[in-house]
Curated annotation (Swiss-Prot):
InterPro entries: DNA-binding_RecF (IPR001238), DNA-binding_RecF_CS (IPR018078), P-loop_NTPase (IPR027417), RecF/RecN/SMC_N (IPR003395), RecF_2 (IPR042174). The lineage of its organism: Bacteria, Pseudomonadati, Pseudomonadota, Alphaproteobacteria, Rickettsiales. Signal peptide: none annotated. The RecF protein is involved in DNA metabolism; it is required for DNA replication and normal SOS inducibility. RecF binds preferentially to single-stranded, linear DNA. It also seems to bind ATP. Belongs to the RecF family. Gene3D superfamilies: P-loop containing nucleotide triphosphate hydrolases, RecF/RecN/SMC, N-terminal domain. The keyword Cytoplasm applies. This is DNA replication and repair protein RecF.
Length: 360
């Protein structure tokens, strides 16, 4: 098994940190400090070395320390391709983010070629009751860990969709270019939908196989393209292309693309109660989310032979003793780098003896 982990992390003008230098090992790491000390900021900085905008999905201008023009995050990281230096920096004046791998610029969606991460934050506990966009992004992040090329596909799809919207809204008379764009969107959609379905199959098996103290979930996806594939429809690319063509007039008025894999929803059910997670109590929702994360970790390691970095923000809060102890034993048994935030060590003393403590 290959472990992805940080050897060091350096922050400059990042949120509340003017400068911060951390040295770490391939072990559990506990960030301990009062609320507002910057624990979650450190997790967020690490998450920037994975496709997307980090675990807060924050606007980049907001991550710079107040009154500073730039911020920098640097990491020496054991990646899928070996030891490497990664940097990501943002300048307010240019409103640009630049990410580098060993001093060579790379696109944000390329990061999944080098790293693998899973995270769980208090904000995510509302994912079952929020909009479908949050759940879809959550599912796609899971897919990244099984298929690193998926991030690039999602990025390309969003680019072509933006181009299509622009042509329609601005009434640009170029039917040939529009046809090419819709064909590209259809082809990419087919790959995205199949990747999601394949990952859901893996994840469902992982959930069913893992005996733990958390409720099991049934996973599915509610999307026209995915359902057509599940129903065995042939020529799926031609079907998507035709749908995009037929919705041109409607989408011109709406100013957006009304059909496609960007409209799909990730559905989660409490297996035993047979009800959608959004109708469960907040405590049950958190427990289901933890169960999904544990299954993802287990199966990602089993299938890809790669252990991701795990970021857990205040994960032990509001867990009963039985579940907290099970989670601690599970995490220790992973033998990988994971980052946990907490305001105190009460209830996790045993875990703390096996972790690197960083006090803020």
């Amino acid at each position: 098994m290959k472990n992805i982990f940080l050897h060091s992390l350096s922050l400059e003008n990042y949120r509340n940190f003017k400068n911060l230098e951390l040295k770490t090992d391939n072990t559990p790491i506990i960030l301990i400090g009062e609320n507002g000390s910057g624990k979650t900021n450190i997790l967020e900085a690490i998450s920037l070395f994975y496709p997307g905008r980090g675990l807060r999905s924050a606007k980049l201008a907001n991550v710079c320390k107040t009154s500073e023009d730039h911020c920098l995050v640097k990491a020496l990281l054991q990646s899928k391709l070996g030891l490497a230096e990664f940097t990501t920096q943002f300048k307010r004046s240019s409103n640009r983010r630049i990410t580098e791998y060993n001093e060579s610029k790379i696109a944000n969606n390329e990061l999944s070629k080098f790293t693998s991460m899973v995270w769980l934050t208090p904000h995510m506990e509302g994912i079952f009751t929020s909009g479908s966009s949050d759940r879809r992004k959550f599912l796609d992040r899971i897919v990244y860990n099984f298929d690193p090329k998926h991030a690039e596909l999602v990025s390309k799809y969003e680019y072509y969709m933006h181009e299509r919207n622009k042509i329609l809204v601005e009434d640009i008379r170029d039917d040939n270019w529009l046809k090419i764009i819709e064909e590209k969107m259809a082809d990419i959609s087919n790959h995205i939908a199949n990747n999601r379905l394949k990952t859901l199959e893996f994840m469902q098996q992982a959930i069913d196989d893992l005996e733990n103290e958390f409720p099991k979930a049934d996973l599915s996806i509610d999307g026209i393209v995915e359902q057509k594939i599940l129903n065995g429809k042939k020529n799926i690319v031609s079907f998507i292309t035709a749908e995009l063509y037929q919705t041109r007039s409607k989408d011109k008025l709406l100013g957006r693309t009304s059909f496609g894999v960007h409209k799909s929803d990730f559905l989660v059910k409490h297996q035993k109660k047979n009800i959608l997670a959004k109708f469960c109590s907040t405590g049950e929702q958190k427990a289901i989310l933890i169960a999904i994360i544990l299954a993802e970790m287990n199966y990602a390691i089993k299938l890809t032979k790669i252990a991701p970095i795990l970021l857990l923000d205040e994960v032990f809060v509001h867990l009963d003793d039985k579940r907290r102890q099970y989670l601690i034993e599970f995490l220790i048994g992973l033998n990988m780098q994971l980052w946990v935030t907490t305001t105190n060590l009460e209830g996790i003393e045993n875990f703390a003896t096996k972790a690197q403590l960083i006090k803020l």
